[in-house]
Amino acid sequence: YTKMKTATNIYIFNLALADALATSTLPFQSVNYLMGTWPFGTILCKIVISIDYYNMFTSIFTLCTMSVDRYIAVCHPVKALDFRTPRNAKTVNVCNWI
């Protein structure tokens, strides 16, 4: 269990969480597509669109963060020992969500 608490695994979990939350909007978008209109009201429309965009940008930021993390791990392995910690990964993920 403790071996699973690496920076890479924390980023992967964050990406999976963002994608799972994005799939929660799919039923609403499917109904909208099939009916050709939005039957759920204005407030739910704004909530679903907000969740969808929020998770889309979080996924993009997380993928960029993972790319930078891999770059540091491969190109600067000595510096990576200090930088790639679970605590730093959690801090970066919180910033991605905000």
From Swiss-Prot:
One of its GO terms (biological process) is phospholipase C-activating G protein-coupled receptor signaling pathway. It is a multi-pass membrane protein. The modification Phosphotyrosine is found at residue 71. The chain crosses the membrane at residues 10-34, 46-68, 89-98. The keyword ATP-binding does not apply. Keywords: Cell membrane, Cell projection, Endosome, G-protein coupled receptor, Lipoprotein, Membrane, Palmitate, Phosphoprotein, Receptor, Transducer, Transmembrane, Transmembrane helix, Ubl conjugation. Phosphorylated. Differentially phosphorylated in basal and agonist-induced conditions. Agonist-mediated phosphorylation modulates receptor internalization. Phosphorylated by GRK2 in a agonist-dependent manner. Phosphorylated on tyrosine residues; the phosphorylation is involved in agonist-induced G-protein-independent receptor down-regulation. Ubiquitinated. A basal ubiquitination seems not to be related to degradation. Ubiquitination is increased upon formation of OPRM1:OPRD1 oligomers leading to proteasomal degradation; the ubiquitination is diminished by RTP4. One of its GO terms (cellular component) is synapse. The keyword Cell membrane applies. GO terms for molecular function: beta-endorphin receptor activity; G protein-coupled receptor activity; G-protein alpha-subunit binding; G-protein beta-subunit binding; morphine receptor activity; neuropeptide binding; voltage-gated calcium channel activity. Its main location: membrane. Residues 35-45 are extracellular. Pfam families: 7tm_1 (PF00001). Forms homooligomers and heterooligomers with other GPCRs, such as OPRD1, OPRK1, OPRL1, NPFFR2, ADRA2A, SSTR2, CNR1 and CCR5 (probably in dimeric forms). Interacts with heterotrimeric G proteins; interaction with a heterotrimeric complex containing GNAI1, GNB1 and GNG2 stabilizes the active conformation of the receptor and increases its affinity for endomorphin-2, the synthetic opioid peptide DAMGO and for morphinan agonists. Interacts with PPL; the interaction disrupts agonist-mediated G-protein activation. Interacts (via C-terminus) with DNAJB4 (via C-terminus). Receptor for endogenous opioids such as beta-endorphin and endomorphin. Receptor for natural and synthetic opioids including morphine, heroin, DAMGO, fentanyl, etorphine, buprenorphin and methadone. Also activated by enkephalin peptides, such as Met-enkephalin or Met-enkephalin-Arg-Phe, with higher affinity for Met-enkephalin-Arg-Phe. This is Mu-type opioid receptor. It comes from Cavia porcellus (Guinea pig). The gene is OPRM1.
